[in-house]
Every structure is written in structure tokens, then in C-alpha cells.
């Protein structure tokens, strides 16, 4: 029997391990920390009984991913996938494409024309090479978010799109930022923005259980300092860490990490008191106001500036729909903004000020908070280099050359050694596809 070693137990590493085990390979996973999960861990970060997702929280790309097919996970679907707060109003990303379009007034037809091709093509959009075969309507994803926003007449449509495009962690004037916005809008219409009951940890726990069922093993508190001997070695690590393990100092030269996250978790005495009632019907709320406000916020970390008074903030409030997250009558919330890589400032007031802007009285409900700065993210997960939680800057070049421009970028210069982290295609997000792709290449080479 062939033997494979996987370094790292995040969703990509475990997805790779499960694929290999299904094909009859004996797999050992090594995890440096004492718990598995990578970017999908859940813990009591504030007060006893309040369970918070340490990194990933809502997983719009996970449920239909072939990497997670057949797992026993209880998914929760809020009535509205996501919403965007405006001063005195809000705009919603509904489950239905037409429902969303209907809320955009004069931009209904434009929104539908932009997003519907992505909805129709969704099952085919798991390979980075699909862009070579896409219809012109889908190639719009290579444009900047600003270019797409110019097609809208209303502030509501521009703001809704900006909030989704900001997940790219790119300036909204940069090429390919539109693709992230269009993809996430389409995800809402294809399958909602769901999350696992109990926390994102449930996803990796299900992957781990499947691996053990298939005869694999997981060793925690097992830091790897040199590449082990095996028929195949798959590394769910950052390119710089792979360069260290492989003793290839030039391997990661030129690979760039993007801005970092600054995150707060709150234990709350009551739900967030949103001024707009519709924001209480979703788990995901984008705070940032207009397109212009969000564009300015997302430009700042690329220019080395910390957040201003009104940063773009992503808020997740799972306890409205998942009573396992907090004691009876209490609630949790999770929020982050983008800051420069390795930034050592404090964005607490800026983030809480944005929440207060749209939910007056919020601060009075905070029982306890947990703060995660860029250095905390990297300490928690070595793949989050400098606090970058998406595996590397999502520039147009690095979407193609991730981490290097090669026909099969999961292969490394070493035989039978592969990279399977979010620093390989198709990139960041909880979908397991980086690991699945690397495992498929490894299986081909093992035959």
C-alpha cells in the first residue's frame, strides 16, 4: 500500500487526505497545534458557553464543493444570505436572483445580466482554466469592481456589489476584484450562504471522521521541520514555509501576501440592535455605506494605512439562527476589517464605531470581547502570514501564478511533493478544492 503524509489539518489538507484515502492510499496527517482545523476552528474565546469561529465563519463555497461531498454536517441557512447596511436603509442579497434584482429598482436588469451567467455556469467553475473557455459575459469577472459598478445607476446596487467584491481583499480599482463580487452574489443564488451548526469546526471534524473511517490517522502537536519520507507528501502550508521545509530558499521569492485581518469576537447580552429590521434576518452583514466609502477603505491597507473612522466591516451573527453558540438569551457576533500586513495598531474603536453607526446602543450590549490582531492570526495559523487570511494577495497575476506559473501548480520542484494550501488554485475560501486538486495530481503521479 502506498503511504502519503499530509502536513497541516486545515480544510485543504484534510480534503487532500480524504481523497487519497478513498483511493486506497494510507494517509498520515501531521498538525503542529493540539487541535485540528487550520482556518476552521471554533472555541470559547470570550466567556464560558459563548462559542466563536476563530477564522472562517460563513462558508458560501463549502456545501456544494466536491471536496466535501457526502459529509455529515448540519447546515444552517438564514432566510437572507447577506445584507448591506446603508444609513437609514439596507439592501439585501436574497436567495433568489430575481428577488435580489427586484430590490435594486432601476438596476434590476443590469444586476441580472451580470450575475445570471455566473449562476448558470456555477457547476463548471471549479477549475482555474475555465476562464479560457468562458463566454464574454463571464470574463467580466476579470474587470475591476469599479468598472462593474459604473454600470449601475443606483447607490444601492453599487453598495451591495462593493460589499461582495471587498471579499477579494483588493482595492476595488484592481483587475479581478469584480470576479469575487460576482462569484459571491452567484453563490447566494445557487446555494445560499450557509454555515455549520456549532461552528466551522464541525466541517473539519466531519472530514477528520471520514479520514479515520477510511483508515487514515491524524497526529496533533506534531510540528514537522523537514519533509518526511513517503510515497507522496502534500503540504498545506504557505509558500515560505514550504521553502523552509524543502530547503529551497528561492521557491517563494516573488510571492506576495496581501493585507491582514483585524477581528473582534463579542459575547452579547442581546442581539445586535440594527436600525434596519431586515438586518436581523441574515447572519452576514456588510457595513461600509456607499461604494465610494468601501473603495476608500479597501485601498488604505494597500497603501500602508490603518483603518479610518469608517472601515468596511464584515459582521457575522450566527447565534440568531444557531442556539448552540451562546447561553439562553445571549448572543455572539464576529467582525473584521482589513488592515496592512503585519499592522500592529488597534482597530477596535473603528470596528465598533461602524457597528454603532448602524445599530445604536450596540456597545452597551457587549459583555466581553476577544481581539485578534494580524500577529495573532499568524500565531494561530502559520499559513496566515502577516495576518493574511486568504493565502496570498489576490492580484490578477497571483490568481494565475499561485504560487508559480506552472501547468500544474500543486507540483513542486521536488518529485512526489505537492503544495495544497490556499496559496494554490483556486485560492482562498473554505472549499477544499486546493487540497482536492493536489491529491488528484499526486494520485496520477503515484500510478
Where are these regions (language model features)?
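A conserved FAD-binding loop/helix module that cradles the flavin
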Residues: 56, 420-443
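Flavin-binding catalytic cores
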Residues: 110, 271-272, 301, 305-309, ...
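A glycine-rich dinucleotide-binding beta-alpha-beta segment and adjacent secondary-structure elements
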Residues: 158-171, 310-314, 361-425
Amino acid at each position: 500500500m502506498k503511504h502519503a503524509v499530509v502536513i497541516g489539518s486545515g480544510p485543504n489538507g484534510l480534503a487532500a487526505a480524504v481523497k487519497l484515502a478513498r483511493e486506497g492510499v494510507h494517509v498520515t496527517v501531521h498538525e503542529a497545534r493540539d487541535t485540528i482545523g487550520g482556518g476552521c476552528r471554533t472555541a470559547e474565546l470570550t466567556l464560558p458557553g459563548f462559542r466563536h469561529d476563530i477564522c472562517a465563519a460563513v462558508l458560501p463555497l463549502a456545501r456544494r464543493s466536491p471536496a466535501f461531498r457526502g459529509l455529515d454536517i448540519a447546515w444552517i441557512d438564514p432566510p437572507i444570505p447577506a445584507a448591506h447596511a446603508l444609513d437609514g436603509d439596507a439592501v439585501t442579497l436574497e436567495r433568489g436572483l430575481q428577488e435580489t434584482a427586484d430590490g435594486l429598482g432601476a438596476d434590476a436588469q443590469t444586476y441580472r445580466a451580470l450575475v445570471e451567467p455566473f449562476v448558470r455556469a456555477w457547476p463548471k467553475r471549479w477549475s482555474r482554466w475555465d476562464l479560457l473557455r468562458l463566454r464574454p459575459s463571464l470574463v467580466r469577472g476579470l474587470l475591476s469592481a469599479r468598472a462593474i459598478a459604473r454600470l449601475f445607476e443606483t447607490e444601492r446596487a453599487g453598495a451591495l456589489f462593493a460589499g461582495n467584491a471587498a471579499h477579494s481583499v483588493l482595492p476595488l480599482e484592481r483587475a479581478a476584484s469584480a470576479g469575487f463580487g460576482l462569484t459571491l452574489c452567484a453563490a447566494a443564488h445557487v446555494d445560499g450562504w450557509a454555515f455549520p451548526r456549532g461552528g466551522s469546526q464541525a466541517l473539519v471534524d466531519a472530514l477528520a471522521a471520514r479520514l479515520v473511517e477510511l483508515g487514515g490517522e491524524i497526529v496533533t502537536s506534531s510540528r514537522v521541520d523537514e519533509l518526511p519520507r513517503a510515497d507522496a507528501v502534500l503540504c498545506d502550508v504557505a509558500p515560505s514555509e514550504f521553502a523552509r521545509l524543502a530547503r529551497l530558499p528561492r521557491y517563494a521569492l516573488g510571492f506576495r501576501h496581501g493585507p491582514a485581518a483585524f477581528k473582534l469576537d463579542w459575547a452579547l447580552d442581546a442581539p445586535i440592535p440594527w436600525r434596519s429590521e431586515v438586518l436581523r434576518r441574515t447572519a452576514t452583514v456588510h457595513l461600509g455605506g456607499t461604494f465610494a466609502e468601501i473603495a476608500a477603505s479597501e485601498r488604505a491597507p494597500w497603501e500602508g494605512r490603518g483603518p479610518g473612522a469608517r472601515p468596511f466591516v464584515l459582521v457575522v451573527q450566527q447565534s440568531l439562527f444557531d442556539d448552540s453558540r451562546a447561553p439562553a438569551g445571549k448572543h455572539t457576533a464576529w467582525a473584521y476589517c482589513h488592515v496592512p500586513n503585519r499592522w500592529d495598531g488597534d482597530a477596535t474603536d473603528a470596528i465598533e464605531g461602524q457597528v454603532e453607526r448602524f445599530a445604536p446602543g450596540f456597545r452597551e450590549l457587549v459583555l466581553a470581547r476577544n481581539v485578534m490582531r494580524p500577529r495573532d492570526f499568524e500565531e494561530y495559523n502559520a499559513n496566515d502570514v502577516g495576518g493574511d487570511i486568504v493565502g496570498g494577495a489576490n492580484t490578477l497575476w497571483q490568481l494565475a501564478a499561485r504560487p508559480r506559473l506552472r501547468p500544474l501548480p500543486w507540483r513542486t520542484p521536488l518529485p512526489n511533493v505537492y503544495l495544497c494550501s490556499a496559496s494554490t488554485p483556486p485560492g482562498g475560501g473554505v472549499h477544499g478544492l486546493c487540497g482536492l486538486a493536489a491529491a488528484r495530481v499526486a494520485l496520477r503521479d503515484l500510478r
